[in-house]
């Protein structure tokens, strides 16, 4: 992932995450990029053009696959502690390993502890290692 991070930084953006998914029988290698103020279509295109010839020679996955480059979006997966840090002030839905569901605003991140304001200014701390799945969400 470090090499990928260094490559996308050449286009003036940061690597948010990368994943391999199987949709409708197609293998898709998704690269999510970010930067302050958001990423443009042109920046996604620049990263795609940078990665395509490299991945033609050294594919990231075996077999046939498709490369997709995009922003992580407004409602995005939080799979790394850094993602929570970048999302301070945003709402998140968190599912713990014991299947408990927590919804609230990310207030702070210290070491591997994430502080969530759940309701009536009540806050709870969650250890990152106890999180099974998390994503941001918009409250309308």
UniProtKB/Swiss-Prot annotation:
SUPFAM superfamilies with a match to the protein in the record: YhbC-like, C-terminal domain, YhbC-like, N-terminal domain
Protein localization: Cytoplasm
Protein's GO biological process: ribosomal small subunit assembly; translation
UniProt xrefs under InterPro entries: Ribosome_maturation_RimP, RimP_C, RimP_C_sf, RimP_N, RimP_N_sf
Keyword entries, A-Z: Cytoplasm, Ribosome biogenesis
Gene3D superfamilies xrefs: Ribosome maturation factor RimP, C-terminal domain, RimP-like superfamily, N-terminal
Signal peptide range in chain numbering: none
Source organism superkingdom: Bacteria
Any single Gene Ontology cellular-component annotation: cytosol
Broad class of the protein's primary localization: cytoplasm
Pfam families tied to this protein: DUF150_C, RimP_N
Keyword field contains Coiled coil: no
Role summary: Required for maturation of 30S ribosomal subunits.
Family affiliation: Belongs to the RimP family.
PANTHER family reported for this sequence: RIBOSOME MATURATION FACTOR RIMP (PTHR33867:SF1)
HAMAP family: RimP (MF_01077)
Protein's name according to its UniProt entry: Ribosome maturation factor RimP
Organism of origin: Campylobacter fetus subsp. fetus (strain 82-40)
């Amino acid at each position: 992932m470090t090499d990928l991070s260094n490559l996308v930084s050449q286009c003036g953006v940061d690597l948010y995450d990368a994943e391999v998914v199987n949709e409708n029988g197609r293998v898709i290698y998704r690269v999510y990029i970010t930067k302050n103020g958001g990423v443009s279509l042109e920046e996604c295109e620049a990263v795609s053009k940078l990665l395509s010839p490299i991945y033609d020679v050294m594919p990231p996955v075996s077999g046939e696959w498709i490369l997709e480059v995009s922003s992580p979006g407004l409602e995005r997966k939080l799979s790394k502690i850094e993602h929570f840090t970048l999302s301070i002030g945003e709402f998140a839905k968190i599912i713990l390993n014991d299947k408990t569901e927590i919804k609230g605003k990310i207030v702070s991140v210290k070491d591997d502890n994430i502080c969530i304001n759940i309701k009536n200014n009540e806050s709870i701390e969650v250890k990152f290692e106890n999180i099974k799945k998390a994503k941001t969400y918009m409250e309308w």
